[in-house]
Amino acid sequence: MTVSPEQIDRIVSNQHHDPFEILGCHQIQQNGQSVWAVRAYLPNAERVSVLCPEQRQEYPMTPVHHPHFFECHIPVAELNNYQLKIYENGHERVIYDPYAFRSPKLTDFDIHLFAEGNHHRIYEKLGAHLLTVDGVEGVYFAVWAPNARNVSVIGDFNHWDGRKHQMARRGNGIWELFIPGLSVGERYKYEIKNQEGHIYEKSDPYGFYQEPRPKTASIVTDLNSYEWGDSDWLEKRRHTDPLNQPISVYEVHLGSWLHASMEDPPIGADGQPQEPVQAAELKPWARFLTYRELAAKLIPYVKELGYTHIELLPVAEHPFDGSWGYQVTGYYAPTSRYGSPHDFMYFVDQCHQNGIGVIVDWVPGHFPKDGHGLAFFDGTHLYEHADPRKGEHKEWGTLVFNYGRHEVRNFLVANALFWFDKYHIDGIRVDAVASMLYLDYGRKEGEWIPNEYGGRENLEAANFLRQVNHVIFSYFPGILSIAEESTAWPMVSWPTYMGGLGFNLKWNMGWMHDMLDYFSMDPWFRQFHHNNVTFSMWYHHSENFMLALSHDEVVHGKSHIIGKMPGDRWQKFANLRCLFAYMFTHPGKKTMFMGMEFAQWSEWNVWSDLEWHLLQYEPHQQIKRFFGDLNHLYRSQPALYSQDFKQEGFEWIDCSDNRHSVVSFIRWDKDYQDFVVVVCNFTPQPHSHYRIGVPEHGFYRELFNSDAREYGGSNMGNLGGKWADEWPYHQRRYSLDLCLPPLAVLILKLDREKTVAERARYNLQS
């Protein structure tokens, strides 16, 4: 016996922080000669021998001190790639010894960068990675658990027995092990023993793939083998400023957009039927569509309607459907509800090849308490604050990340980068930013701790957000980083070098509330609330705002958008058209939730899919046609998007006609030669001679009329356009005498070609 009984006992009881010191091969002196001592701890093994392929020799191993701790001595100069022949339960198997492969992947520099919070691609080091060491293929595992006594890899390959693959501790509390012979598809977890001896089974925080809920094991996968076809899209994105482009976002929850029958199994990339994932307990006959099926159905739908981007409610792995994805346990794993990581890559790839960008909701503000997740990860408060006054959201029943800890911050910063790097996404929308920025968010007096200056601002969270945005824009110019921030925190969408948080867009929650309040009231009373319509332009240029009517506005008893509108059925649809036409002509990028485009009546229900049957009825067909035309018009007119965030891009014609509840304004293109005129009538009262001032003489073509017959309107309008009169109005030399339809928006544009032709004809006649 060349090792002490105490050391063997530590291995047997799984209490050794570095099993490589005992197990594997070690050169020793025996009778004045150098020999190799090979040791192995193999629970359940009846007998074991060492195979040396180079010498074509087999060396029996002997139990030492413990019936399953084996050792043998091999008198050779070099011992490479030896194998263990194991007899157990009447079966024989041959494996490479994991403890013959020391430190194959993680360097001291990796550990240093991680410890200071600056290893931007730590996901290429921690987690589970296919690796070939000395010609032997296997999987390398690494996990950060600094306060653990021991960590093991468990899985189907070792019958979930933590004694068989004990990991070795490296610097800064990182544990690692290379297991030969494993490959893609292996299920695994980490068995973590804390200092008191309690054992926790945890999914891999850096795992790329997990089992469908309710199972929780991580799955080994290879993210680098997918062949992308979107290089042209990525190259164009890199050289494009998205703030000067049209952005019209269709917000989607993939699990409730459309369901399929459980009797119709999905077909995988290999052409074989796959196991369907049931959509909800209350709908046992329904299943989720896969990422590939969604690519075939959702992308053409979005493309037809003219949206520029799809925004996905969180697709990172989460255990509870009812959280909508906002309680994440697998930050590096697209949810397996809809397929594999390669399937999600295919979805994004197909979006790009069809000219559609992909934004994903990202949730760095909190995480759930599920036992297999990040909570109490190594037996201590590792990812979360230990003090519940900083580490818990009681309102949501979730935990708050410790943004002041370098390794936790690194986990999140690298995660944001990961989705751009590995999945080619085009943007993130950061959820619940206000809950991160304020220490007293959702807390009563005495339930929170002030910052070092005595204030309520979470300085660590603010610095974290700056770091995230600085990093992702450094690697991927041309992307979007959108903040859902509901307070007046300054400079949210300003660059970090100017003192901002570094986002390039912020949801305009004030505009959303003002508009929904305004449009939900009886039109007669709108004259007394005219400020709801005009107020947003007083502060619009303080941030880069995105106008969003999101999923949050169609749940929890709020009714869907069409249900918020007053009046009879005709007026409800007219109000809806008026609201969205105003939204698409107001400065700012656009986001709207699924179902709004065809006026779904029922609230969004995560357990069901959309009310597609409504499209058999003409009013819903007409509103869908309205949205398609509105989107395509928006994208075709640079004046409606190219100067969203410059004061010169917007000009009121008249914002003071509260008596009629009418506003009119001009949107200018960046060269100030092209412009559109917008007139909004927010009451059911039409106006046959409504005059507005315009900047130039000529024929103004009616590009869009939300009251058109094809949209279900009354078809009032201006017969295709109007000539401007040389009649000064609104401090302008020329004016238009318009017919304003009820509850409608008109978009007009100077037709320079017709104007020049008419002038030439007039001069010729003269």
UniProtKB/Swiss-Prot annotation:
GO terms for cellular component: cytosol. CDD domains: AmyAc_Glg_BE, E_set_GBE_prok_N. The keyword Transferase applies. SMART domains: Aamy (SM00642). Keywords: Carbohydrate metabolism, Glycogen biosynthesis, Glycogen metabolism, Glycosyltransferase, Transferase. GO terms for molecular function: 1,4-alpha-glucan branching enzyme activity; cation binding; hydrolase activity, hydrolyzing O-glycosyl compounds. Its EC number is 2.4.1.18. One of its GO terms (biological process) is glycogen biosynthetic process. It comes from the Bacteria. The active site is at D431 (nucleophile), E484 (proton donor). InterPro entries: A-amylase/branching_C, Branching_enzy, GlgB, GlgB_N, GlgB_N_E_set_prok, Glyco_hydro_13_cat_dom, Glyco_hydro_13_N, Glyco_hydro_b. SUPFAM superfamilies: (Trans)glycosidases, E set domains, Glycosyl hydrolase domain. Pathway: Glycan biosynthesis; glycogen biosynthesis. It catalyses: Transfers a segment of a (1->4)-alpha-D-glucan chain to a primary hydroxy group in a similar glucan chain. Catalyzes the formation of the alpha-1,6-glucosidic linkages in glycogen by scission of a 1,4-alpha-linked oligosaccharide from growing alpha-1,4-glucan chains and the subsequent attachment of the oligosaccharide to the alpha-1,6 position. Belongs to the glycosyl hydrolase 13 family. GlgB subfamily. Monomer. This is 1,4-alpha-glucan branching enzyme GlgB.
